Amino acid sequence: VARDKTPPVGDTTPIAGPKGQEIAPGIEPTSGEKEISHDAPDKEEPRSILMNGIQEITNTLVEDFKLNDLILMILETMFRGFCFNCVMFCMMEPKRTRVQARFGLGRDVDKLIGNFGFRLEKSSDLFNIAVSQARDFLIDDSNAPTIKAQVPQWYRKTVNAPSFIIYPIFIDKICLGLFYADKENEGPPIPEDQLNFMKILRNQLIIAIKQSRL
């Protein structure tokens, strides 16, 4: 079952940005994708992990910070707080023809991150809908009859997790990329009472990118 939360908090009206526009100058270019491997999430109370992580990110935002480091802080908070198997930040490429994973945490992320990406197309698959229509997706069962046809083949071959989330990131009506995360079992990828934490974490990245442009 897909729970479609739309629209995301922030500037979400989708329009295509100019080709080659530098939409997130604070994110350092990489010749190869960056990744950090983690073991399974710890057993600390998830809600405490989320609240403490959000507070730490808030404190960082009022100091001098590197955007890459802050992205990793957000990913770690998501990974540990929501007990995900894998989390990734995927970025829109400058020509705006492809979204590609750039940072990640979790099991086998070093193998996944270079292959996790997709071309922008007029398609009914979940990833293209997310970035073209500014829609969040929380997938409880990727093999459910109502959603199976919208899960693209590249994803089936690369990850094929039973439950996952797609949270696009928009600033000034332009999509910069998305957060992706998954779990190994079917069921809600984020508990209903923790959805607001995910919105806060995304908004913190939006604030960080805006500050990096000043």
Question: What name fits each language-model region?
Answer:
Residues 43-45, 183-201, 208-212:
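Regulatory loop-to-helix N-cap segments in sensory/regulatory domains
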Residues 64-101:
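Helix-loop-beta substructure at the N-terminus of cytosolic sensory domains
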